[in-house]
Regions:
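Short beta-strand elements bearing conserved aromatic residues within extracellular beta-rich modules
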Residues: 76-78
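Short, well-structured beta-strand segments within conserved domains
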Residues: 49-53, 101-114
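Exposed aromatic-hydrophobic patches
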Residues: 93-99
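Short, compositionally biased P/S/T/A/G/V-rich stretches that sit at domain boundaries
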Residues: 21-44
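Short amphipathic, basic-aromatic surface patches that mediate peripheral association
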Residues: 54-68
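Short beta-strand segments within Ig-like beta-sandwich modules, predominantly Fibronectin type-III
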Residues: 84-91
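Contiguous beta-strand segments within globular domains
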Residues: 43-57
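Short acidic/polar inter-strand loop motif in beta-rich domains
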Residues: 86, 112-121
Length: 134
């Protein structure tokens, strides 16, 4: 009996934790005027890099996460060297030096709605990518 109960709890825990692990949302077409992302990167005097996200036609709205979608609003996802680092809910982010392990490092930003749906233009993800050289 104990072994049966253990397996039921174990497999349900594994299944349920993986069910929501990656928020595999849909793709949603952005509304016109389309969002534009400009990113400014500056070396931090102590360690790492400071990123500033200048967004046009897109509103960061952490107060609405998992509540409702509004046109061209939500959050950003930050990838460094193709590794998801964080969700971004404000215009500024400090990226520690440990994420910049290569001579040429790739930074990518993608836009998502409050329900974790990827924003697109003509079914292509809205993203901005550039390189940071050490």
């Amino acid at each position: 009996m104990f072994l049966k109960l253990f397996f039921i709890i174990f497999f349900n825990t594994i299944f349920l934790s993986n069910l929501y692990a990656h928020h595999p949302g849909n793709k949603i077409e952005a509304k016109i005027p389309y969002p534009i992302i400009n990113i400014k990167v500056s070396r931090d005097k102590i360690e790492g890099y400071n990123l500033f996200f200048d967004l046009q036609n897109f509103k960061l709205s952490p107060e609405n996460i998992e509540i409702r979608n509004k046109n061209n609003s939500g959050y950003l996802q930050l990838f460094i060297n193709d590794i998801k680092i964080s969700r971004i809910y404000s215009s500024w982010f400090h990226a520690p030096e440990r994420f910049f392990s290569q001579k040429e490092n790739s930074i990518k930003i993608k836009l998502f709605t409050n329900f974790h749906d990827e924003l697109t233009i003509d079914n292509q993800p809205i993203e901005f990518e550039f390189k940071v050289l050490k």
